[in-house]
Amino acid sequence: SNELEHDFLWRHYIALPEKGKFSVFNRTHYENVLITKVHPEYIINERIPGIDTMEDVTDEFWTNRYESINAFEKHITTNGVIVIKFFLHLSKEEQRQRLLRRLETEKHNWKFSPGDLAERELWDKYQDCYEDILNKTSKEHAPWFVIPADNKETARYIVAKTILDELNKYEFHYPELEEKIKDNIKMYHDKLSSEK
């Protein structure tokens, strides 16, 4: 795939919004320190120089990856991107209930994959990885917000409120019109108003 021709941050960098625009990222570069840490065999497929065997995927490798993420986020925030990261914390029991509902509700069957059960067996390993991610990558310029997510409505409210609170820290302005256009606003308005 094209992604494997680049470093692990490339696909996220090219997906960043233009200045003045918003984007929501689901399944971000944190997959590269989550899924690949739970399944380090996936790292071999990334064709990283010096990483040829599972023994090459060391603690130093993960430290470097966290540092790359922190440097990436520092770079983009320095250049005007506002980064707000949410970890939707779901209990194991709530995850079980949601998976059961997917199986019991025909219109939601499509959301289920047998792989969900295999990954669920690795719950504790995922929790350890989440803890590492939160501890090693929550920075003042790119903080993590841990959201209790067993109740969807509550989680959505907290996320929306957090986004609003974070954006209210900034003073945003609409783009300015060129003087030539601004000086002729009344003329443009009159022209449109007089159309029949």
Could you say what each language-model-derived stretch is?
Residues I14-E18, H75-V81, T137-K139:
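Conserved catalytic network of the ASCE P-loop NTPase/AAA+ motor domain
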Residues S23-N26, V83-F87, V146:
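A structural signal for short, well-ordered beta-strand segments and their strand-loop junctions
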Residues N70-E73, T77, E131-L134:
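Structural signal for well-ordered, non-membrane alpha-helices
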